[in-house]
Amino acid sequence: MEKQELKELTVSIFEKLRQAIKKGDSAKALALTDEIDRNKHDFDESYRIWIDLLLTYIADKLGEEALYEIHRINGERALWPRLGWILESISPEEKIRRRAYTWTHWHGTTLDAIEEDEEKFTIRVKCDSGGSIRMWPQYGKTKEAHPWSWGQKDVCYYCAHCPVVFEIMAIEKAGYPAWLCNPQPEGRCIHYLYKNPANVPEKYYKRVGMKKKTAK
């Protein structure tokens, strides 16, 4: 092989994109952007397959309650260090900006909509993490109803990290859920982020086996 070809094989697609932008080659830059998007989501899918296999194997061998512990540990080690700002004293507008960013800039997902009413913000999204798994013909799901699966059977093992971390653990830490996840058909999900945590309806506490503390 030619040395030049070997050298070119070492260059990341991001560096190729930077060079195309610097040269003003918009056609190549757009093609590379599409390739990055395609490869990112395809490779993410391989990780989802892996995670689902691991969670299913653990549930089968150790029982479903072991998944609750795994999701809690993952919450402390991975999720709260990155998303703990949601429980800080920042404006609800800043919270929704940051929450949207996690979808658009971390997942690389374009949201269906962000809506606002007097009480809350609503995010509508075709979820390409847990929502993607729920589109598979087979995947790990709860055989029994647990507080950490919103009191329901047939909840995706992967998706259960949402009620465990952002509802149960958030209530333990701050007294209220970070946001509320509501899986929908066709891999979609609706998230509610209440502007004033005191206005989160009690039903959302009950569905994860928690009690809402009333102001004295």
Where are these regions (language model features)?
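N-terminal accessory segment detector
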Residues: 1-160, 165, 171-188, 196-216
